[in-house]
């Protein structure tokens, strides 16, 4: 306690010499922090008698108050000086000639999303939205992917807790829409989805569009013609399209869709996978309270960045997210 006044004086001198906010904060920690030299004086109270402690405690608090007041005053001065310096540096010379504005443009992913939505809108599809933070039921269970199902491993899911996650696809929007209404349905569900993956063709966040049609007397032939027509209109040319048998828990039968994209070195057709599709599984209808004996449906899903890469000739998916103006200006 006998050197308290000296500590206060040292602190005030240090505050006065501080010429920037970082140095001032270091002084605050040194003198008033949890292990600060003035704060530590409180430990000496235990050595004093009960009669001496109140007065000693008051002195320590007054000492802390003095230094704290000086720090606050110095901080205000430094912040004011910083603002004045910045304003002086940013002063405008009104005699300089004017500069034209550099107009922006839509991001290529936004352009692609809008193009997809416009194509399906002409076919009578509505655009439905849903939450990006989903529950396990709508993201997996209601899509015929129970907890023990190995297909869950394909999704590389970001979990908040065992029952809450970032959606891995936009299919939950279809479930929520079917739960809230009655068939027939004709919808697309665009939006951001999340999976723990990152390389030249994958990012942890990307965009999907998933479509659903539920009506009476729907067949795989209807699905096939819808997909083929969409791809023809999107790429603005006739394409050879191939449907390969595949597996998705929420559709049966299921298929992967490939398009002809150039030629292999041996002259054979080079096929590129662009989307997945299938007939809605009866179990999914059961979860949504729809009679699968009366109604049938088909679903499809596609990656927006994937189609944007093909349409614009982009080789690396990550370029869409790097905010490089040299890249983005090409799409205005």
Swiss-Prot record:
Note accompanying the cofactor annotation: Binds 2 magnesium ions per tetramer.
Enzyme Commission number: 6.1.1.20
GO molecular function, one term: ATP binding
Protein name: Phenylalanine--tRNA ligase alpha subunit
GO cellular component: cytoplasm
Similarity comment text for this entry: Belongs to the class-II aminoacyl-tRNA synthetase family. Phe-tRNA synthetase alpha subunit type 1 subfamily.
Catalytic activity, as annotated: tRNA(Phe) + L-phenylalanine + ATP = L-phenylalanyl-tRNA(Phe) + AMP + diphosphate + H(+)
Keywords: Aminoacyl-tRNA synthetase, ATP-binding, Cytoplasm, Ligase, Magnesium, Metal-binding, Nucleotide-binding, Protein biosynthesis
HAMAP family assigned: Phe_tRNA_synth_alpha1 (MF_00281)
Binding site for Mg(2+): 252
GO biological process, one term: phenylalanyl-tRNA aminoacylation
InterPro entries: aa-tRNA-synth_II, aa-tRNA-synth_II/BPL/LPL, Phe-tRNA-synth_IIc_asu, Phe-tRNA_ligase_II_N, Phe_tRNA_ligase_alpha1_bac, Phenylalanyl-tRNA_Synthase, tRNA-bd_arm
Subunit structure, interactors included: Tetramer of two alpha and two beta subunits.
Stored PROSITE patterns: AA_TRNA_LIGASE_II
CDD domains cross-referenced by the UniProt entry: PheRS_alpha_core
Pfam family, one: Phe_tRNA-synt_N
Compartmental location: Cytoplasm
Obligatory cofactor(s): Mg(2+)
Record organism: Marinobacter nauticus (strain ATCC 700491 / DSM 11845 / VT8) (Marinobacter aquaeolei)
Gene it is expressed from: pheS
């Amino acid at each position: 306690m006998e050197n308290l006044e000296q500590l206060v004086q040292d602190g005030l001198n240090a505050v006065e010499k501080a010429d920037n906010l970082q140095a001032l904060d270091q002084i605050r920690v040194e003198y008033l922090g949890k292990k600060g030299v003035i704060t530590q004086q409180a430990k000496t109270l235990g050595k004093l008698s009960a009669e001496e402690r109140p007065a000693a405690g008051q002195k320590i608090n007054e000492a802390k108050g003095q230094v704290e007041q000086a720090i606050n005053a110095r901080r205000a001065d430094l912040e004011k000086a910083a603002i004045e310096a910045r304003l002086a540096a940013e002063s405008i010379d009104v005699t300089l000639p004017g500069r034209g504005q550099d107009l922006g443009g839509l991001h290529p992913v936004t352009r692609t999303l809008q193009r997809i939505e416009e194509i399906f809108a002409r076919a009578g599809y509505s655009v439905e939205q849903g939450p990006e933070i989903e529950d396990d039921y709508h993201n997996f269970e209601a899509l015929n992917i129970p907890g023990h199902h190995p297909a869950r491993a394909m999704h590389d899911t970001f979990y908040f807790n065992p029952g809450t996650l970032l959606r891995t696809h936009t299919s939950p929007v279809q479930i929520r829409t079917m739960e809230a209404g009655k068939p027939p349905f004709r919808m697309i569900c665009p939006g951001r989805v999340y999976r723990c993956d990152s390389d030249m063709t994958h990012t942890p966040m990307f965009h999907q569009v998933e479509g659903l049609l539920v009506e009476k007397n729907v067949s795989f032939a209807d699905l096939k013609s819808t997909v083929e027509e969409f791809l023809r209109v999107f790429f603005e040319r006739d394409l050879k399209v191939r449907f390969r048998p595949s597996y998705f828990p929420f559709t049966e039968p299921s298929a992967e869709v490939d398009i002809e994209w150039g030629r292999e070195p041996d002259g054979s057709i080079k096929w590129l996978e662009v989307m997945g599709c299938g007939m809605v599984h009866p179990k999914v209808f059961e979860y949504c309270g729809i009679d699968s004996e009366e109604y049938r449906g088909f679903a499809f899903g596609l990656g927006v960045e994937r189609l944007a890469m093909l349409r614009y000739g982009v080789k690396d998916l990550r370029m869409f997210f790097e905010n490089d103006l040299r890249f983005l200006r090409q799409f205005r």
